[in-house]
A protein has these predicted regions:
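Conserved Radical SAM active-site core
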Residues: 1-4, 17, 35-100, 107-112
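Short secondary-structure boundary/capping segments
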Residues: 11, 113, 135-137
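P-loop/Walker A phosphate-binding loop and immediately adjacent motor/lid segment at beta-alpha junctions
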Residues: 77-83, 88-91, 132-158
Length: 158
């Protein structure tokens, strides 16, 4: 998996101060996407063990609330294995940090994916330019914030 951005301090993508990872690769290609440079799977740099160590060193700080994973599309088949491994590692070493994940896929499509075991909050749904709104965490009214409680059938949607 490649990534186009690893931000040590992010206050725009989830609550508090967070670390954010922007993965490369997206086949959805939403019209009006805020990040079209992320569509190419080869854009940016390869996510390596060194990248993981760097990301974890950022999460080590007490004032960091968690990790936000955006894209691109983190749940593309090419990205999903690395995203799962990353989330599993973060939850193992930082169980009190939250993981937020943005996806252009709907919650019904992703709710049973293995990665969802590690996600605390998902922002789900494709960006639809005709439904554009100004929201702090998503860009169109069809998208949802879903806070997961550990029981996929007991999630809280915003």
């Amino acid at each position: 998996m490649n990534y186009i951005g690893l931000n040590k301090y992010d206050t725009a993508n989830g609550p508090g101060i967070r670390v954010s990872l922007f993965v490369s690769g997206c086949t959805l290609r939403c019209k009006g996407c805020f990040n079209p440079e992320s569509w190419n799977f080869k854009a940016g740099k390869e996510f390596t063990d060194e990248t993981l160590k760097q990301l974890c060193s950022y999460l080590d700080k007490d004032y960091i609330q968690g990790l936000s994973i955006l894209g691109g599309e983190p749940l593309e088949p090419e990205n999903e294995p690395t995203v799962i491994a990353l989330c599993k590692t973060v939850k193992h070493f930082y169980p009190n940090k939250t993981i937020w994940l943005w996806t252009g896929k709907t919650y019904d499509i992703i709710k049973n994916l293995p990665v969802m075991e590690y996600i605390d909050t998902v922002v789900a749904g494709p960006y639809e330019q005709d439904l554009h709104i100004d929201h702090c965490y998503y860009g169109s009214s069809n998208q949802q914030i879903i806070h997961l409680t550990g029981n996929k059938n007991d999630s809280k949607k915003e």
